[in-house]
Every structure is written in C-alpha cells, then in structure tokens.
C-alpha cells in the first residue's frame, strides 16, 4: 500500500518471526559482577489520568459529595399527598412488522382504563419537600400512573422504592398542558433542547430547570420509569400513533409514509423563515430553504431557526409539531444525582442533562430500543461521572454533546469520566457527538464491557465513535479510553450513509463500501467499525456546512475484541478502524474556504481487534481492515489485527 492517497504506513508490521532470535540471553552482554553497585531503577511515572493525582481521578474526587446522603433525612411519602396505585393490564403491540417495529422491554403492560393520575400528588410532595429545606420524596412499591412531567425542585431526592413502576401517559398533550410558558394553541410548554437545539417544547416526563441539589433514585432494576412511548394514544392496528410514530420512519411504529405527521413530514404550521426572521440575508435564506433539507419539516425547521438567529422564546413547538421530548431532562442544574433505577419505553433520548455542573449517574439501566433512544447524552455539561450503567438502547449508549448550529452558548462538554459500564446493544458504545458545536474535551473512559449481548439479532454497531461534520463543527481534545472488552465484537456488516452523502462529493456511495482510493472514498461509518472517527456524518442532512471540526489528542489502549460467526461470516467487526477526516467539498459558506484540518494526534496501543471481515489487503475495489481519509498520523503501537501486529503510523494527506 504505497499510494499517497490511500494509507501511508511508516514503522513496522511485526509477526512472530521477528522475535525468532530472542529466546535466550545476549551472548555479548557483560557478565554480572558479584558485589558491584546496582543502579537504582528509574521511578515509574505516575499515571497522569488514573493515578493518585490524575485528571480522571480528580474529577471523580470532586464528585464524592454527590450522594443520597447529602439530602436531608426526611421522607415525604407520596401517598400522604393523595397518590394511589393503579391496576395494570397486559398490552399487545398493534404493529405486526416486528423487524421494523420491534417490541421494547416493558411494552407488554399498561395501566388499566380509568387509572388514577398520581401526578398532582407527586408534585405536591416535591413542593412540600423543597419548601421545607429538602429531603426524599418516596414512591412506594406498586404501579403508578402519571399524566405529565414530574418537575423536580431544589434539594429534592425523588425516590422509587423496589418493585415500583411509574407509567407515564403516552399522550403528548399531557406534556403541554401546564408548562411554565403559555404558547397558545401549541400548549403550555417547557424550555428544552431537541437534538442540541434550544426550543419550547413538550416537557420531559422527568424534568428540572435551574435547580440545585436534585436526585432521581431507586433501589435497582425493579425501580422503573416507563415512558410508554410504544403505547398508542390514537388510532389502531398498524397505523396506530405513539411517540415513536413521530420519528417518521416509513412502516415503523404506525408511520405509513411521508403523509403521516412526524418530524420528517411537511408541517404546514411552520411559517416561512422570512416571517419569523425578517432580517435574514438572502444568502442564508437560500441555504436554509435548499430542497435537500426541506425547511418545513420540524427536524430541519428548528436548526434553521437557530441558524437564522431566532430567539428561543420564538422557537415554539409542542402541539401541532412532532419533536419528541427526552425521558429525563435537567437544564442548567447543579449537583445532580441519577442512581439505581431503570428506564423503559422512552420517547427520545433517555437521559439528557444540559448545561449542568457536577452530574453523577450511577447504577442506572437504560433499557429502551425505540428510535433515537440513546442511553445517556450529557450536553455541554461540566464534571460528569457515569459509573456502572447498563445499556440496551435504540441508538448510542453514551453520546456526549455540546450544542448544534448557533446554540453553543453553554460552551464545551468537559471533564467527563465513564467507567464500569456494560453495553448490550446500540449504535455506538461510547460516542462523542454528533452535536458538538461547543466542543468536547477531557473525556476519560475505562473498564467498559461492550457485551453486545444480542449480536445475532440486534448488534452493537460501533464500539468507540467520534462523529461530527461541517455543520456540527466543534472540537474533540483529550479523549482517553483504557480497557474495553468486546467478547462478541460489533456488527460484522458494514454500513455507510448512501443518500445522506453529498452529490458530487469525493465521499460517495459509488465507491465500494470501506474503500478509499486516490480520488474517492466510502467509509463504513454508520456500523461495522470497532473504532470510528467520522467527520463527515450525514452531511446532506444539514443545510449549513461552514464549520470544520478539529479532532486531536485521542488515546485508546487495551481494547480487545473477539470473533463470532454469523451465517457465512466470522469476525469481530467489518473493519477495525474507520478514520474519515473532514471533507473540503462539504463547505458551502462564503469564500475563502477555511483550513480543513486532518484528524491528528491519535494513538492506539496494546489492542487486539480480532479478525475483521475485511481482513485482506486493501485495493481500489476491496476494503482492508483500516480505512483512512484526511488523517495526519494515527499511531498504532502493539496493535493486533487479524493476527498481524502493527507498530506503525497511518497517514492520508488530502
């Protein structure tokens, strides 16, 4: 592989033959002399990340006070405020295509008709607890129905007992009936973020804003928050409407196609951008109304409002729109604890703290496989510990974010530690991005078991993932991963972005998947890579592409992946490393085009990546185990791929 525009290797590929003469001592070495002075061994340098005064250790230490014992030792039982348990009945999914509409855990039960709404009692107990100086609001064992958001207040620990399930109303109207902002026909809404863009929208089932010292806790996996996002609230049969219908995936969860109201349908309630942003320039208006990203769709309209500089108070969604709320969303809060409970059937992202400082999430099971059901998405937060979580998700297990488009007012996501977690299924095990406009820095991860438990039917797509594009921009700095075990590998099937790539781009689907030639490439960036750097994430989905991303100082060590056999394929992944740097073609802003930085400063060491399906030599028609485009030095040290040892540097100048 000597082509400058494929992968430039410098260094050595080491096999067992290289070690053939090293079985004994050196015949020319001087004999030891009895009684001679022995030089002192050099001191072992302290681990700068996990050592006693390491960066990650200091973050963990700074969060030692975020515990349940920090709350006043006074309980407020919700039954004392009028809460009543509800009967539960069996529920059968109306959706018959289980390939497109798989049944999520917890979807087989729902409160019986006429169930008592305990939400007023929950809110009354929270208010009393906070007013008295704080304590613990306790929901006892049993099943409870809640028709709207549980809004936490300062100094309150909202606690689910063992064998306690709160079933939230599946009806979107219940999350727009009494929020703090009266938005007329759109309902009474909540300040929120949807895919890292600020807006007024449906309230999250568990919500807080500008609160201090709050906790959501339980006693293990039987303490359950069930969002009932798969439970229909209208219609019947295969066209019944539930929260997940709003994704707009044809044939999935009641979506019959483009005419079904969803985030991806032409919404007549979205007014022309010149009306809502009268000062918009003609150049910006042209970009935002490009038919490739139809502005009338809610999923494109909100980013367009951000790019046009429309104030958040005028970005009104809720009723008449189709942007799903997160399950747990805390905004602008300090000292946040989420511990020892179980989420199921969530409308959107399962946990979304935004602009929060001092966040601990520990022992939580994120267990929902619907569309966009990420497990934990801290957004522009500072000082975060994610410890001992278990993930079974419909999207990324962990995705660290920091705003999108012009919504980067909260700055970077920084000082995060992720440790001791298990990833059973999902798109990415640990992901940075894609919404990372404010940047991401100082992220430390260790001891992750990416079990990929359902590898035969619902495989983990990627283990370690960075994703951004010319719209998201931002930066990744100081990302350290140490110790990832993948006993069942990741997806053996590669996957690219197809129609989400830009027409005319050198990155396009006419190139065989996983191949980079001197002039074109097609990364397997959506699935199949153990480690994926993707700086060209679905570029056709964004109208504005003017912000190149910077990825630098990434260190990954001690990753071990084992092979599995699925059908005729045996392997640990499709490709071991997928490194797609920024693509200059994507830029669509004013001239001149800014500098387009390559991925730089990456070290991968002491890893055994098993055997990729694409294990053979790379060519212009056949993928090899490594894909690289616009990369300035990925150093491999003691990295084994398909039995071959790599000590080399990967470079691909563009």
Where are these regions (language model features)?
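Short, recurring structural edge motifs at helix starts
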Residues: 144-145, 204, 373-375, 405-408, ...
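Predominantly polar beta-repeat domains that present long G/T/S/D/N-rich surfaces used to bind, process
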Residues: 567-574, 579-580, 587-654
